[in-house]
Amino acid sequence: MIQVLLVIICLAVFPYQGSSIILESGNVNDYEVVYLQKVTAMNKGAVKQPEQKYEDTMQYEFKVNGEPVILHLEKNKDLFSEDYSETHYSPDGREITTNPPVEDHCYYHGRIQNDADSTASISACNGLKGHFQLRGETYFIEPLKIPDSEAHAVYKYENVEKEDEAPKTCGVTQTNWESDELIKKASQLNLTPEQQRYLNSPKYIKLVIVADYIMFLKYGRSLITIRTRIYEIVNLLNVIYRVLNIYIALVGLEIWNNGDKINVLPEAKVTLDLFGKWRETDLLNRRKHDNAQLLTGINFNGPTAGLGYLGSMCNPQYSAGIVQDHNKVNFLVALAMAHEMGHNLGMDHDGIQCTCGAKSCIMSGTLSCEASIRFSNCSQEEHRKYLINKMPQCILNKPLKTDIVSPAVCGNYLVELGEDCDCGSPRDCQNPCCNAATCKLTPGSQCADGECCDQCKFGRAGTVCRPANGECDVSDVCTGQSAECPTDQFQRNGHPCQNNNGYCYNGTCPILGKQCISLFGASATVAQDACFQFNRLGNEYGYCRKENGRKIPCAPQDVKCGRLYCFDNLPEHKNPCQIYYTPRDENKGMVDPGTKCGDGMACSSNGQCVDVNTAY
């Protein structure tokens, strides 16, 4: 997989202005004291229940730069999955997993009245803390520690004293943007009905965040402090990704309070590889999820603030990223995590031609002091191309309502325990099969949505709801008893395909020839067998796998499970042993797992040529 670095650059030096104040975010030189006035405005359906501590909607009025503003807040009901869990460890190493009640939480999204482009991400747990955008500028707000007072400080990030003003440069500040032409082609594609349905469907990323041991020490060994910081980060992630029709549900939080489960090292690439493997072999066996992010207190070598695999969402090992907790202002840490998750969703670094209407966009190769929460036009097209080409399936699945540990919330678009359907608020609902006020089916309806729901009735048994996508896939059909299409079924792994040139693997037929075409174009073919002997060298030109960052040479019988060697038949390309290799994406150009490497033999995920019956 391609790994993409994110680093920090903060070049401005800000003069001392007025008296300084110490806030959670650091020493702030220039700030405005505001006094919040809660505005009573009971919206339809926004009745506070007697046992509810935090209201579903709130409004506050205060002044910014002497002008009154009204901040509208709405509880982020998509912040947690119904089966959200937290894991930490006892002193003797025992795993302790709990399902804390998170329904009546204090995390909100919002907007400023009469500013159509405004956004807000606010924690209302103890006063208001977070950020809001007003007339294109980002402000931070947090309570002053004055007893029995509504006094808050409002300030800009530029007025926070920096612990280290030394400019930091980026190892990959420039991206060649080699896929720019592909982006143009993707936007001009005539999509199949299946691709169009996929693009239009809302996406749900079930996220697990892991905080390492240094984070535990950094925040005074306080599980509560770390939990609060991560909740605030995920609340902002939801604001950022909502524009892409993506909902992020935190399904798990794990804190390594008794020591790290992997070696968390200053070498970001090594740490990411170790974390991805741990996710695949350990975390996924304990907690079903789509994506994992490691939040670490370690300082990576150089200016690196994060690292993520490119185009890897739903992959067991590579749907992951690592992020350094590099700033007291959690807004900037959230931007770094949004950036790494953007790589997982197929977005590369922005080139000079990319724009988002701000000085810096989410997928800029550097994280600047003037960062915005917007994706550039390039990022949005790159993401769209990735969805069209790869169609990752796990993010189509809403978080399950089974194993629910908190009360259902009608109107959050998630069907939870006790609900038949959920089409949003009565104002937004456009589904005639669902009563938005009760989240129950309308009279006479059997279903409200699903691939096997046809005009509020279950589809006829045997109706194809998911056509076969190639010879290694099978068509899935409706049962007549449910609105949902059954679990996607594939031809069994190891079944011969492509005229016995390959074996089916997770619904695809990976063969060397197609992989060469994918890398070098239609004129490419597989190189001669002699070329694959370079995989015995154990360097960038040939190896079978990496262990702790070290390239392991292929054994003689495994050479066709290492780097892929191709021959491009175009006259201008004379190299008979051509590979795809660049330092920033070392894993691209390796032979895909499941590829046939001999009669009855296939490549394992560990780069070994093994019996096809044991390869999977």
Swiss-Prot record:
It comes from the Eukaryota. Belongs to the venom metalloproteinase (M12B) family. P-III subfamily. P-IIIc sub-subfamily. This is Zinc metalloproteinase-disintegrin-like protein H3. It comes from Vipera ammodytes ammodytes. The active site is at E340. Its cofactor is Zn(2+). One of its GO terms (cellular component) is extracellular region. Keywords: Calcium, Cell adhesion impairing toxin, Disulfide bond, Fibrinogenolytic toxin, Glycoprotein, Hemorrhagic toxin, Hemostasis impairing toxin, Hydrolase, Metal-binding, Metalloprotease, Protease, Pyrrolidone carboxylic acid, Secreted, Signal, Toxin, Zinc, Zymogen. The keyword Magnesium does not apply.
